[in-house]
UniProtKB/Swiss-Prot annotation:
Membrane topology label: Single-pass membrane protein
Regions that span the bilayer: 313-330
Keywords: Coiled coil, Membrane, Nucleus, Transmembrane, Transmembrane helix
Cystine crosslinks: none
Gene Ontology CC entries for this record: nuclear inner membrane; nucleoplasm
Subcellular location: Nucleus inner membrane; Nucleus, Nucleoplasm
Top-level taxon: Eukaryota
Native source species: Arabidopsis thaliana
The protein's name: Nuclear envelope-associated protein 1
Stretches of the chain forming a coiled coil according to its record: 125-261
Complexes and interactors: Forms heteromers with NEAP2 and NEAP3. Interacts with SUN1; SUN2 and bZIP18.
Knockout consequences: Double mutants NEAP1-NEAP3 display reduced primary root growth, and altered nuclear morphology and chromatin structure.
InterPro entries found in the cross-reference section: NEAP1-4
């Protein structure tokens, strides 16, 4: 080969060598870049996988949270229904308690009225007993007077019978004496003396008989007056005794009626007291039930407030940060 050809070939070879070296360098740089790109791609794929996994986990968490939110909403609705039912029941219990209180007030008023009436009836009974005692005393006094008058009447009747007997005896004695005198005169046989004695006897005997008859008539008049007075007194006394007996029977009847009324009022008072005790016990039980219902309502309200606070977990800053980061990751992945 000539020198001119060598001189022309050398620069070409040099250029070729330089090009080869530059190509090699480029290939090496490309290989390194390819390795870097592959490493980046692997890292990006790993990060993408991680992001997909985190996204799936976030989606699962979101679904779980949605399910929990639905469950909490259902529980909240159920508790609201229970709360409304308990509130309505509490209102009913309160209304019933008010009705029981009104009944208790009415029963107390009736019991007080019955107690007042019983007290007034007791006072009336005591007054009637006093009146009855006074009337019994007066009746006893009248009975004593009646017995005294009866004794007096018996004495008068005895005296009257004795006077009648003595009058009969006197008349018999006078007749006997007249007979004896007449018999003695007849036996003596004296004529003039007989006529004179007969005249004297005729004069004396009518005078005595007239006097005796007058005395007897006076005594008879006195006896008739006494009999009339005794009859009047006995009639008045019988009338008074009948009136007193009728009054006594009336007083006894009124006393029995008042005793029956008192017993009825006492029975009504006992029933009213028992009803008041029962109503007080029912009222206390209702108060306890209302307190328990109010406590349950307050507990349910507190639980509902706590669940509502738990239900508002999306308002928390941590949840907002997690959601914003997941959204940014999803945007970056979608852009890539």
């Amino acid at each position: 080969m000539s020198y001119s050809e060598k001189t022309t070939v050398d620069p070409l070879l040099r250029d070729l060598d330089e090009k080869k070296e530059s190509f090699r360098r480029n290939v090496v740089s490309l290989a390194t870049e390819l390795k870097q790109v592959r490493g980046r791609l692997v890292s990006q794929e790993q990060s993408f996988l991680k992001e997909t996994i985190t996204r799936k986990e976030a989606e699962k968490r979101g679904k779980n949270m949605e399910m929990e939110i639905c469950k909490l909403q259902k529980r909240l609705e159920e508790r609201n229904c229970q709360l409304e039912a308990s509130a309505s029941a509490a209102d009913k219990f309160i209304k019933e308690l008010e009705e029981f209180r009104l009944k208790l007030d009415t029963t107390k008023q009736t019991a007080e009225a019955s107690a007042d009436s019983a007290q007034s009836t007791k006072i009336q009974c005591s007054m009637l007993k006093q009146q009855l005692d006074d009337k019994t005393r007066s009746l006893r006094e009248q009975e004593d007077r009646m017995t005294q008058l009866g004794h007096q009447l018996d004495d008068l009747q005895r005296g009257l019978s004795l006077r009648e007997c003595s009058e009969k005896q006197l008349r018999e004695e006078v007749r006997r004496i007249e007979r004896e005198v007449t018999e003695a005169i007849a036996k003596a046989g004296i004529g003039g003396m007989d006529s004179e004695l007969q005249k004297l006897l005729e004069d004396v005997s009518p005078m005595k008989f007239e006097r005796m008859n007058r005395l007897v008539e006076v005594k008879d008049e006195e006896i008739t007056k006494l009999k009339d007075e005794i009859r009047l007194m006995s009639g008045q006394w019988k009338h008074k005794t009948k009136e007193l007996e009728s009054q006594l029977e009336k007083q006894r009847r009124t006393d029995q009626d008042l005793k029956k009324k008192v017993l009825k009022l006492e029975f009504c008072l006992q029933e009213a007291r028992s009803q008041t005790r029962k109503l007080q016990r029912k009222g206390e039980r209702r108060d306890m039930e209302i307190k328990e219902i109010r406590d349950l309502i307050s507990e349910k309200q507190n639980l509902n407030n706590e669940s509502w606070d738990k239900q508002k977990f999306w308002d928390n800053s941590g949840f907002k940060i997690v959601v914003s980061m997941s959204m940014l990751m999803l945007v970056v992945v979608s852009k890539r």
